[in-house]
């Protein structure tokens, strides 16, 4: 066994060889908080998720997969990314293979629907050809494909009900991703695939869940996010939204396996104020004493919901707290000082 110094030098040499051969980020220490330098990103609409992703959002020039059960918030999260990209002056496209895009809901999430490019393709091949053409143009900042499960191969659509088409969709995805990854990287476009969950038959041990479309997307995706609804949010007897957990199950641009929770409110999307409040309490930027929440010398509310509404009504205080969370070195400044 090598002594510690020699082992460290040998390890550094091995890591540099791996990075030289396979690119920066092929290997990293899990405890290392530093993400890869110079990675441009698009915010997700949730500050806690941006921090968990390690680069301030979803990375540009990469393939992203968002998967989860039905009604877990997959499309909501993707629409928030589109909204944030548009705020930065970017152009977004939505390949609606499910033919289920709700324009009114997208507008409520802040998407400029007049500027959004939408395609509703007839076949999986058509959807992926359109995606390739848009990405190759170099003008698109974010492209969402909703969803992989709805990318039905032409042969299956033209065939009869009951015909067997084993592995057709997996082959289609594999071929498309082989073509797409290079141009996605060169164009600096963020391509988000939304995916559904299926159950493997006959799995006795381990997780029986799997995603549709074969294994290609699992390999080609730089970031994979597992999104789940964990609780219903109620106001009296009315359901107003859901508590959502996102786990970053794969991340090639920063350490993976981070988990975050936030609220998705019906008709509003991700509750940004609630997300900032939870994160601020966790990082001691906002103090919680009993049911009261205080920021500096000011009490902002009794109970989480009242405090969230206070932040919604006072965007300048929300922006100040957000700045302290994004740049922790400013915590030394007096909290609440305007």
From Swiss-Prot:
User: Do you know which PANTHER family this protein is assigned to?
Assistant: MITOCHONDRIAL DNA REPAIR PROTEIN RECA HOMOLOG-RELATED, RECA
Under SUPFAM superfamilies, the record lists:
P-loop containing nucleoside triphosphate hydrolases, RecA protein, C-terminal domain
Query: InterPro entries, alphabetically?
Result: AAA+_ATPase, DNA_recomb/repair_RecA, DNA_recomb/repair_RecA_CS, P-loop_NTPase, RecA-like_C, RecA-like_N, RecA_ATP-bd, RecA_C_sf
**What GO CC annotations are associated with the protein?**
cytosol
Q: Which species does this protein come from?
A: Citrifermentans bemidjiense (strain ATCC BAA-1014 / DSM 16622 / JCM 12645 / Bem) (Geobacter bemidjiensis)
**What does the sequence similarity comment in the record state about its family?**
Belongs to the RecA family.
Q: Does the keyword Phosphoprotein apply?
A: no
What this protein is reported to do is described as: Can catalyze the hydrolysis of ATP in the presence of single-stranded DNA, the ATP-dependent uptake of single-stranded DNA by duplex DNA, and the ATP-dependent hybridization of homologous single-stranded DNAs. It interacts with LexA causing its activation and leading to its autocatalytic cleavage.
The molecular function terms in GO held by this entry are: ATP binding; ATP hydrolysis activity; ATP-dependent DNA damage sensor activity; damaged DNA binding; single-stranded DNA binding
Listed binding positions for ATP are 68-75
What's an example GO BP annotation here? SOS response
Q: Where in the cell is it found?
A: Cytoplasm
Gene3D superfamilies associated with the record: P-loop containing nucleotide triphosphate hydrolases
* Protein name from the UniProt record: Protein RecA
Alphabetically sorted, this entry's keywords are: ATP-binding, Cytoplasm, DNA damage, DNA recombination, DNA repair, DNA-binding, Nucleotide-binding, SOS response
